[in-house]
C-alpha cells in the first residue's frame, strides 16, 4: 500500500462511517447513535442499534473492557483484540437478534423499511473488511456454538477470561 498515515486514517474514518450504525467507546463509555436534527423518537432500527450498543456498555461494566484495552495499549500489543471483539460483537448481535426476533409481522416490516442504505463515498482496500468479517460473521458462528452448548453463561465465561485469568489467556483471531 502506498498510502500515507493521514490517508490511511481518513480511510479508516470513512470505513467507520460506512460500516457502523452506532458505537460504544470502551474508554470514554459513551454510546453514540447518529440521529437526525430535532428527532424526538428513535425508530425501530435505531432502537435495535441502541440495544446492540447497550450490550457493549454492559460488557464494559462486567468484563473490564476498558482495563483490557488500556493494558493492550500500554503494552502496544493488540494480539487479543480481534478475538475478544469477535465474541463481544457476537454477544451483542445475539441479544439484538433476540429483541428483533420478538417483532410481530407489522414491526418486522417497519423495522426492515427503516434500515438505512449506507454507502461509502470512497473505494476501500479489501483488507479493511478482514476485521469486520471476523467480528460480524465468524464471531457469531462461534457464539452460536458456545450458546448452544452452554447457554449465554458460557459466552459470558469466555468474556470473563480477562477479569479472571489475565490478558494472555484470551483468544486470538486465529483461535476464533
Tell me what each language-model feature is.
Residues 21-32, 58-70, 112-122:
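Active-site-adjacent bridging/hinge elements
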Residues 48, 90-94, 140-145:
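Solvent-exposed, polar/charged alpha-helical surfaces in well-ordered, non-transmembrane soluble domains
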Residues 4-32, 40-41:
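Catalytic zinc-binding patch centered on the HExxH motif and its immediate surroundings
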Residues 49, 53-61, 90:
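Catalytic glutamate of the conserved HExxH
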Residues 119-176:
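Pan-zinc metallopeptidase signature
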Residues 31-51, 80-84:
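Short pre-active-site segment immediately N-terminal to the catalytic Zn-binding motif
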Residues 62-117:
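Post-HExxH zinc-binding segment in Zn-dependent metallohydrolases
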Amino acid at each position: 500500500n502506498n498510502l500515507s498515515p493521514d490517508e490511511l486514517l481518513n480511510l479508516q474514518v470513512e470505513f467507520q462511517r460506512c460500516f457502523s450504525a452506532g458505537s460504544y467507546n470502551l474508554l470514554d463509555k459513551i454510546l453514540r447513535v447518529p440521529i437526525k436534527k430535532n428527532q424526538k423518537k428513535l425508530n425501530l432500527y435505531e432502537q435495535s442499534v441502541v440495544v446492540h450498543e447497550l450490550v457493549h456498555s454492559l460488557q464494559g461494566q462486567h468484563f473490564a473492557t476498558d482495563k483490557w484495552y488500556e493494558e493492550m495499549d500500554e503494552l502496544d500489543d493488540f494480539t487479543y483484540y480481534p478475538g475478544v471483539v469477535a465474541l463481544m460483537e457476537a454477544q451483542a448481535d445475539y441479544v439484538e437478534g433476540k429483541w428483533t426476533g420478538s417483532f410481530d409481522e407489522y414491526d418486522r416490516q417497519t423495522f426492515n423499511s427503516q434500515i438505512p442504505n449506507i454507502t461509502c463515498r470512497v473505494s476501500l482496500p479489501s483488507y479493511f473488511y478482514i476485521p469486520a468479517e471476523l467480528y460480524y460473521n465468524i464471531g457469531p458462528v462461534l457464539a452460536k456454538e458456545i450458546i448452544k452448548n452452554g447457554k449465554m453463561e458460557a459466552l459470558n465465561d469466555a468474556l470473563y477470561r480477562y477479569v479472571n485469568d489475565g490478558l494472555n489467556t484470551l483468544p486470538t483471531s486465529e483461535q476464533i
